[in-house]
Amino acid sequence: YMLAIGMAGATSIRVGKAVGMQNVKNTQVSGFVGLIVAAFLTLPFTFFAVFYPETIARIFFIDIEIINLTAQVLIIIGCLAVFDGMMAVTLGALRGTGDVWMPCVMQSIAFWLIGLPIAYYLSVNLEYGIIGLWYGLGSGIFISLLLLVPRFYMISSKPIVRL
């Protein structure tokens, strides 16, 4: 995730520079290249978390029950890592365009109004426990990404004029 955060900062700078130059094409290219790079940067973690979760868990724990639960959670986290990294970079790209308030609203909707209730329902009502919490968080991440990427595309499709 830290690589994706670094990529978000770099993407924000590149997008901001393109916006300042009134270059629509470079604004979009900078944002979408950042998304692709973030996805590729998170793939190694995803690979190990999905295919070797028990090995990773054994590095930190001895108790077999904790290892098994951690392995289950690592698979979910591994699958979410790509989307989480892409979400972070999309936020950076939007920051570079100067759009900060609407992404905040979108994040609030995705996590507080969608992700949290799903997490609660799965973890408490259906008794999925920590797995349900991660499914809820994952739904927030995924919904957020589905809201933010079209927002960036819409904003970056025309010159951005700041007063």
Region spans (language model):
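Hydrophobic alpha-helical segments of multi-pass membrane transport proteins
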Residues: 76-90, 140-155
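Cytoplasmic juxtamembrane regions at transmembrane-helix boundaries
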Residues: 100-112
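Residue-level recognition of transmembrane alpha-helices
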Residues: 38, 74-77, 81, 107-108, ...
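Small-residue-rich hydrophobic transmembrane alpha-helices
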Residues: 1-53, 84-103
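Membrane-interface helix-loop junctions in multi-pass transport and translocation proteins
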Residues: 53, 59, 67-68, 111-145, ...
